[in-house]
């Protein structure tokens, strides 16, 4: 179960070691006793009394520093050696302790070791009691599709005792579910000399397994056990028995897999060399020209050789690993690393047995030594994996293989690693792209180890990195008839024979070759995404597998979104141009380019297309290739890439053609595509500000600090701001900070200085109106400027204001300067945020997926009813920036959807209590500064907020500037972690299932309506809708959207919710969607907060007397307070259950309009007006219109 290795990394990290790689089931593991051969050179117990290891380093320091050393013993030789090894091999003593503790926890409990030994002895006795005989009818199903009925099979008693293979033999079993592999060898007499042909060996192997299984089920020793068949490594030619012993000793945490093998001498030497054919075309009813050579079946041959060479290979591995704790522990480290990346799953998986053989290979090459520590073993393997090329072939053969023969071997496989016998390729089924991926992951591991600024242990061993989270796009084909059609019409006969007509590797080869040629430089890797085959009861028929395929594409950001595929010139290369037209079909056209060349070309879009459209180019290419070459309709294919981009698209309810603007806007535009328009408008405004004449002081710097200037605004910003009656109406404002030249004439009193700032802003507004014809309005927050339909808020920053905010006068009259909440806020907004905003803008220029990943992350958090007061927007931006800055994967993120999945992983698996998220922009932090900050963080953790984020521009506020104790609080942080884990489960289930389609945005971007006590509905006409795509409310059905423009900068709902939190956070928690949400969800605090308490003058809020000198908080009183604060915005209060009942009964919740109508109906009807005399006509009826409240009028 590779996907469940790490179940509770947070708990392990709290211990300071992050070493519990099997927290899902602690009962499998135990702490082993210290060993002198564990690769860390543990201090051996000397004859004299030794100094404890934990005090070795401090005593060494004391020995140097103190003059009185009479009672202090110097370190022992063992302790000195251990310290020297720590300094030479590891980043720090912490890393060494983390590795050491993880290895100790990976060791099996003695009860499992005893059980395995006893079970093997019992099974050996059972096999001795088996009798030779004819296999007649069986109530079990043979776990293989046979060409004919199993009649006449003669069972021969095994002549060799069963033996352990794999991890059980080398002492490297890994939990949480322990899988013990046992091999049972068929005797040579069971096979005939012609059994190498046409799957006869494989059929006999399956029959032999069935016979042994049936006898085991009849034996009283195994009567209570659970029997299942399964395919080893998703290979239908490799059925194995999976037996789960039912005993209290192992408690169903152990599984035994029985492999049937055969001796190497069963067939003539050289019968299964890669260039031989062992499956005849006639076996599948095909005709073959006798004059043509038969195609080689190298992959089928390797499949048989796996069984034939297993005994010899295992003997050599046992010899290499026996009593070598360092090799065993090194292999355990590598297995953890491999399993966390899910590179060992399925038919094409890079199995741990390959790494075990590679350790022996490096030992033979004298790259690894007997005395190498476990850490050195793992590091050396990663380093050699990254820097050696197996495509040319490497060999473990006892008898050296000539270079010519090795090259001949390598020609038949993508990857070649010859085993000890010199006949079997251990990497026969590994495709080239997957091997390259393993090399890249190994290279990344070495780079992480070499980064002295980083604690690489959790990144290498603790974090789950499923393969689907490493790819940018995913291609799924699961239609059974389409798969059969492709295999029948397009799979080459030689490939069919090579893989014994197994569909999966044929599909993998067919699609990989086609996409590799069609995508070319657009794609970096094409990786198979496999899931392990599920076991089935032995009484059931073997399932048909291989009729489904899923590929992951890792894109090259530099070339993936190019709109043109340019072919050869028609005049210079006629054959090449013809081949280009044949490959691309009707998409190819002859085009003339600006340089005068005339070539064949395929155009997939225009240079002016939005980033979201360009990200779909690879999708269009893939679907065209499948349709043109494989006749596969796009409806039969599921291509996953960009589905979640919908959440930051413009709402279809808002019609852009009604806007009065010179900009060319599409109805299907989105927030990402609209950002450059605002940035260009801001750049022009900045030039106009710099060009203003006759200002008292020169403007020296202008900085845009709103999220849109760093491509992080999830709501589409349109040029719709208006000037109405000297008031600017705008849905959003863009903040701009300006700084002036130095002057000594500024007041030294805070109020006077702010008044002078306001006067200066007014003068700037007047100059903008006179010289640039721009409308402006002064507000309490700054100068509002209207330009091209966008509203900008200009703020003036001055150092003296910050100093005055910090200024305090002591009782003795001494003036001091002390940081406070107001000064920190001002410093962040005016001086630090401009620098961080510029750094994030630069990050987006480097990684184009950064901004859109932030958009997805912000929209997800907002739809989970988490506003800026509960989870700061800047925290989201900085966490995503942390993802792009850190080397979590060999390739940078090219697709926003992938970035969003990794953001969810960061929220799910991070240890927020022990991790400080550092963003070293421009490498402006020195190593020592980082070390000092991390040390201060660890030693004073309680002084930092629950989520600590620091940038290199934060100065003395590092770690405390962007978040606080309440935003997010510990509870909110835990809530977000649980939400992220659930979202990941939904995504992974939909991605890896062959039956389910990819998750719809509404499944992820809509909050649950469970867990809330009350819901306060707002009047929909007083709360404008967001311009972003509305995915619906978790509480009520869709309502008519309201896109009215409020007064610029007046977010009334946010202010009211802030007031509610500041006044009533001790009694309730408040949640709402800041992107146009029209409901406020409330969760009451525990009942203890509402219990009667003694009377205190300072604690009387919302209380009433309840006798005996006590007071009590009443929820009814609180609700009345809430209504009073919400004033005209409040519509009604209901419980989620009441809202659900209304939905089930198809009753619409009472809307504001209906409420008004009910009120009107309850009033006495007015008297009818009589007709005027002298006129024969009635007065025309007045049009019905909505009478807006005074609050709405105040918005204008």
UniProtKB/Swiss-Prot annotation:
Residues 22-31 have a biased composition (Basic and acidic residues). It comes from Drosophila sechellia. Keywords: Chromosome, Nucleus, RNA-binding. Residues 1165-1174 have a biased composition (Basic residues). Its main location: nucleus. GO terms for molecular function: RNA binding. One of its GO terms (biological process) is tRNA export from nucleus. The keyword RNA-binding applies. Residues 1-75, 1140-1196 are annotated as: Disordered. The lineage of its organism: Eukaryota, Metazoa, Ecdysozoa, Arthropoda, Hexapoda. Belongs to the NRAP family. It is found in: Nucleus, Nucleolus; Chromosome. Part of the small subunit (SSU) processome, first precursor of the small eukaryotic ribosomal subunit. During the assembly of the SSU processome in the nucleolus, many ribosome biogenesis factors, an RNA chaperone and ribosomal proteins associate with the nascent pre-rRNA and work in concert to generate RNA folding, modifications, rearrangements and cleavage as well as targeted degradation of pre-ribosomal RNA by the RNA exosome. The keyword S-adenosyl-L-methionine does not apply. GO terms for cellular component: condensed nuclear chromosome; CURI complex; small-subunit processome; UTP-C complex. InterPro entries: NOL6/Upt22, Nrap_D1, Nrap_D2, Nrap_D3, Nrap_D4, Nrap_D5, Nrap_D6. Coiled coil: none annotated. Part of the small subunit (SSU) processome, composed of more than 70 proteins and the RNA chaperone small nucleolar RNA (snoRNA) U3. The gene is Mat89Ba. This is Nucleolar protein 6.
